[in-house]
């Protein structure tokens, strides 16, 4: 789980503290690179008391739908929940030609697969949330290539938010 998180987070290069939309788009680009195909994220309202995310694997790309009413940091958690399902699906299953693969709807929150996906989504949310909450003027705000950039990324991974003034 941590290896996948590292594989998705390591390529992300955004100014920290990050604009939530910029971080979200950078994560989507990283997921697309990891998948080796485009991942299109759509925002839509889900009916109350139902799912907050959905993944459809198409012939040439993936569609992920996240609840538009969720805060962006929560949309990151939802997206990463769906990414975990992408990671766990057997790669050798052929898709019906011209149609999306069958959708596995969550029927039981206690299913081990759903708990793993939730755990991964929360892990990613925790690790990336610190990129949003970092105060300006810390090492996290260094430009890519700046020697402080590495220190900032380490600090972000450890949830370090700088000294209080």
What do these predicted regions represent?
Residues 1-165:
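Active-site hotspot residues in diverse enzymes, especially metal/ion-binding acidic/histidine motifs
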